[in-house]
């Protein structure tokens, strides 16, 4: 018998290991509702640009310091693991000192999101996107953070089916809600029909499907397709 705590850990592990794929569907929104979505997306773009400007300022200050550049050089040219570990600690300390951290990025987005009237989950998701860009600059081959141009509208992502864009089932159909706007989807071919039906089947009995997924992971070290919606 698996305890509740172990069950949650295994389910989280399954979600990390399992494959993901994107299903693109059209909504049945009216043109006026589509315009509202465009307005929201532009607000997210503006909020993101404001956060990018703030984080780029701190990042530029950090990389201009001789000590940070020296530490980066030593870290990249040292093979000794213990020395690299010590250098990594020093680099992280400097990143904290100059507010180039995920925590600072996340908390800075809170007042910015409120300023533009953006739902907290959309603001958090945008902050995560920006932080991934910062990580590329810090640890990979990214050169600089970029602003989103006018009409370069970002996706509106909620990540969770009960926040931001709640998903529900009504009359055996997927229903969504964005703010006060409710809408469905258009299913145009057999592939989309099969995919949507698989999602509906999961939503009817999520615990049963999750249990099967966990048992398969434990017994066969294999991830089955559950069609759990995550967006």
Regions found by a protein language model. Give the residues of each.
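Nucleic-acid substrate recognition interfaces
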Residues: 1-231
């Amino acid at each position: 018998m698996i305890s509740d705590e172990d069950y949650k850990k295994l389910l989280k592990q399954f979600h990390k290991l399992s494959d993901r794929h994107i299903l693109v569907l059209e909504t049945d929104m009216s043109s006026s509702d589509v315009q509202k979505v465009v307005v929201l997306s532009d607000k997210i773009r503006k909020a993101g640009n404001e956060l990018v400007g703030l984080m780029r300022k701190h990042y530029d200050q950090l990389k201009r310091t001789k000590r940070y550049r020296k530490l980066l050089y030593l870290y990249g040219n040292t093979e000794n693991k213990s020395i690299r570990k010590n250098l990594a600690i020093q680099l992280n300390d400097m990143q904290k000192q100059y507010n180039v951290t995920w925590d600072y990025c996340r908390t800075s987005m809170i007042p910015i999101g409120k300023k533009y009237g953006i739902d907290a989950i959309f603001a958090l998701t945008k902050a995560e996107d920006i932080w991934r860009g910062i990580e590329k600059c810090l640890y990979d081959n990214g050169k600089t953070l970029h602003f989103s141009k006018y009409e370069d509208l970002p996706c509106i992502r909620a990540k969770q089916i009960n926040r931001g864009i709640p998903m529900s089932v009504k009359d055996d159909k997927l229903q969504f809600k964005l703010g006060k706007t409710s809408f469905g989807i258009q299913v145009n071919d057999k592939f989309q029909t099969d995919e949507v039906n698989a999602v509906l089947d999961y939503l009817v009995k999520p615990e049963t499907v999750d249990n099967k997924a966990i048992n398969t992971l434990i017994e066969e070290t294999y991830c089955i397709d559950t069609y759990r919606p995550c967006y």
